[in-house]
Amino acid sequence: MASNKRPRSILVACSLTLLLFFATFASNGCEGDDAPWVLSLQPYFTDSDLEWDPELVGTWLSDDSSLKMTFTEGEKRAYKLLVVESDSGDQKSGQFEAHLLRLGSDWFLDLFPTGQLPSTEFIEMHLLRAHSTARLELHQNSIQLSFLSGAWLKKQLKQQIVDLPYQETQGMLLLTGTTEDVQRFIYFHADDGAFSDEARLFRQEDQE
């Protein structure tokens, strides 16, 4: 059963990693203030891993309307994803490229930001785009996204239970290994509590 806790900001977790200005993105998190974001320099997929499911296309909305995700068809078995987050009347949106893949018996999404932030060329020099991932459960009228838990991963790394190249900086765990490294990690630890930052969304009918 999905957790009732509101997930931390997906736009923060998945969007441009601001190595220069990261501290400006304050967010109330279900894992606590000390839980780092988890991002990967390399994608979680290779071209041969990619799958396509037309049932994912459409608009999905959380129970409290704080999170809306709209998937449309992209190129080369990719989805275009628009994420809109609402909080006390304040609305923010971000654009992503999403890829669907299967590792073991589970489905996952790789999310990569494609939208532009208003900035100067100098500022853009200091921004890093990185990948995030979530385990996906796709049902007829709902989806559940379980994002990689930074609190869980940080604990496993410190206890040397997980062996994965990474750097910790600015409240973030930046995975620096290869695609093979991060896939192996997911394959062996997906059911160990690694994916516990959950969001459930419900399909919205097309409005004529």
PLM segments and residue spans:
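N-terminal secretory signal peptides that target proteins for export/translocation
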Residues: M1-R8
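Bacterial N-terminal signal peptides
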Residues: C14-F25
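Short hydrophobic transmembrane-like helices used for membrane targeting/insertion
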Residues: I10-V12
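Calycin-type beta-barrel ligand-binding domains and close structural analogs
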Residues: C30-E55, D63-E208
